[in-house]
Amino acid sequence: VKSARAILRAAFFGVATVVWSGQASISIYDFSSQLNDRFANSSSFVAYAYNLSGIGLDNNGQWLTMISPNVFLSANHFHPSTGASVTFYASNDPNGLSVTRTVTSTAQRIGTSDLWIGTINEPLPNSFVYYDFATQDITSLGQFNSSPYKDAVAFIMGRSPTGWSTSQDMAVGCNKLDRWFDSITVGGTTDDAMGAVYDGPSDPNFVSSEARVESGDSGAGMFVPSAGGKLTLVGINWFQYTAGSETGSGFSYVGNYDGQIQSFLNAYSVPEPSVFGTVAGLVALGWGFSRRLRKSSG
């Protein structure tokens, strides 16, 4: 993998003060609503086989990806604010079952990264999913090259060019994870990052629905399919970059912060409402919630 570090120009995006009309939609090669819009509710949707009910956009257009029934990940530079309202949909049907929650003040930046972790006021019902997240430490190009994520084809979430209502403004593209950035500084944050080059159709790494993040996509999740038809949350959209003639997307890699994420989950995660009655008595006896108690993204 060639290094773009020395010549990288990273474009920090998704500033919270940017108005709705200034937020660009995700770039997807040969975009079509039926193929790429979640709420077109089409069987040809690129992520049709996967459950996206644990992904939400708040009323300000900021992203939440659930990692427990009440805990979410987002981007530090563009995260949901306390009191924001967010709607989650149980399916890709825009008229189907949905629930609305409020973002609480129990939230924090994860270390000095661009990751943000927070909570909603009430757990999602058990008909909604949350996602397992990457846990492998990757701190060098060599470790990335030997990891399961090198050249994996990822699903990249972003805003749609179609013009949906805010809570349904979700499009999905794909890209091959083929870049690693050591200690890149973007918008005042310095961290390692995973990357995906935005290739053209003639490039050998080009994939169908090839995608690149844009300004409205900060804080959305980047997922890699895992065993059993589930999705693993591997990254959170952080930046877009240009290096010579190359452009692409950069993601905060979740796996390097799994310990801090799990500590937050241990402190603040609660089970979905359906299990409150059966475990309430156990809580007083030191019962600890684990994000692995039920399947997470089937």
Segments predicted by a language model, with ranges:
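A short, hydrophobic C-terminal helix/tail in secreted or cell-surface proteins
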Residues: E272-S290
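C-terminal membrane-anchoring or membrane-association module
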Residues: G288-G298
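Chymotrypsin/trypsin-fold serine protease catalytic domain
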Residues: N121-E210
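Bacterial N-terminal signal peptides that target proteins for export
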Residues: V1-A11, S274
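Bacterial N-terminal signal peptides
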Residues: R9-V19
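Sec/Tat signal peptide C-region and signal peptidase I cleavage site
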Residues: W20-A24
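Catalytic-histidine neighborhood of serine endopeptidases
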Residues: S68-P69, L73-T112, P123-P125, K150-A152
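C-terminal subregion of chymotrypsin/trypsin-like serine protease catalytic domains
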Residues: S25-G56, N60-H79, V172, W180-S183, ...
